[in-house]
Amino acid sequence: MRRGIFVAPFGELADPRVLAEVAARAEAHGWDGFFVWDHMLYDEVEAIADPWVALAAVATATRSLRIGPLVTPVARRRPQKLAREAATLDLLSGGRLVVGLGLGGDRGGELSRFGEEADPRARGALLDTGAELLDAWWRGEEAAGVRLLPRPAQRPRIPLW
């Protein structure tokens, strides 16, 4: 059995240096994974770190932890940007990235207030299409008329959860 920590990068943990220190301590105490939420807004929380930038700090502060966002809403992140960010982070981490994909929710207007798709069925279609694109691009294949390189460190691709 593996053990992972699921952290909301909010408040004090919105500082990627603090988050990286927490991850390093978790690794030193035998934890196997370190995962962060991906939100733009959340209830009364004001300070929220970008998970991809924060995970870059975590990657450089650790050596063996599996890392990743749980979950990233593809409808908000855009597949092409997500593919590039994830491949870069996977290379930086030495192949330790896991990407959790999901619909995301519009709780508190987290999507609609920024002009993003709020309808769950439409987000579901975007998730399906996005997962197919990510799979192809991370395998080094052409999709939507383009190849996105470099490929991630993991083969055949980054694990999708």
Pin down the residues of each PLM region:
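N-terminal beta1-alpha1-beta2 module of alpha/beta enzyme domains
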Residues: 1-61, 155-158
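Short linear capping/connector segments at secondary-structure termini
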Residues: 37-41, 70-72, 114
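Flexible, glycine-rich active-site loops centered on histidine and acidic residues
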Residues: 2-14, 75-142
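Alpha-helical structural signal in soluble globular domains
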Residues: 25, 29, 57-62, 88, ...
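Active-site glycine-rich loop that binds ribose-phosphate moieties when present
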Residues: 142-149
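Short, charged beta->alpha transition segments
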Residues: 53-57, 85-87, 147
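Short, surface-exposed connector motifs at secondary-structure boundaries
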Residues: 64-67, 150-154
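Structural preference for beta-strand elements that scaffold enzyme active sites
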Residues: 2-6, 33, 64-71, 96-100, ...
